Amino acid sequence: MATTKRKTARAVTPNLGVERAYKRAMEKLIDEMSNSFEYWLAAAYKANPPRMEVAMDALPSAELSKKVRDLGKRWIKKFDDMASAIAQKFTESGRKATDSSFQQALKDAGFAVEFKVTPVMRDAMNATIAENVSLIKSIPRQYSMEVEGIVMRGFTQGRDLKSITDDLQSRYGITRRRAANISRDQANKLTATVTQARRVELGLFEAEWIHSGGGKEPRQSHVKAGKDRKKFDVRVGCLIDGEHILPGQLINCRCSSRTILPF
């Protein structure tokens, strides 16, 4: 007797609008921070043009270091002040978008539901907010530490303004790319978190792995899981490479999954 194929609901993927809005919010602060450091650097050069033989006398290294650190502290405080609001907006927007997409996917499969913010969902969102606050706060700390090294080396070596500014621009590009990676990675994780919580609430415990097909260096184990349409218990995760994981949970994982319906 042939086995009846069980119905599935289409996969829920991250909302690109939410991801881009999150990226833009971080980029706006990064742009302002980078411009601030470059403006300060130009002013410092105008006041004390570094020459190898007098650089340390014109602006002692301890004083220069203090000035860079003071500017860094101001930007650390600004990011700290903004981090919670940015993280909350991203998390709530992502939760709503994922709920809406999953609700429609279930409806299309003949399973109509209405979602509410349950205590379990609230706890999951609070954890997501905390993780993103930490990531946002790390941006100016890493940036200012790198900039201090660039500026200090430039002044003590007597390098011209353009060469140091070029190095700052390179660091700026790295920082913007990090913001893009954070927004993409966290959008994937948020989608996985919300989808898993909703499945558990509804008693929809089984899912089927889908490989994204994207990325320059895909994890071959994820490719195989998608090709095999590997099924897993969403309460535990899919056993891949010796650990139980959810699609989109690991860094740079863009995989998703279909919900297997119990009818």
Briefly describe each language-model feature range.
Residues 1-173, 261-263:
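N-terminal leader/targeting and assembly helices and adjacent pre-domain segments
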Residues 170, 174, 178-263:
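Acidic, glycine-rich two-metal-ion catalytic cores of nucleic acid-processing enzymes
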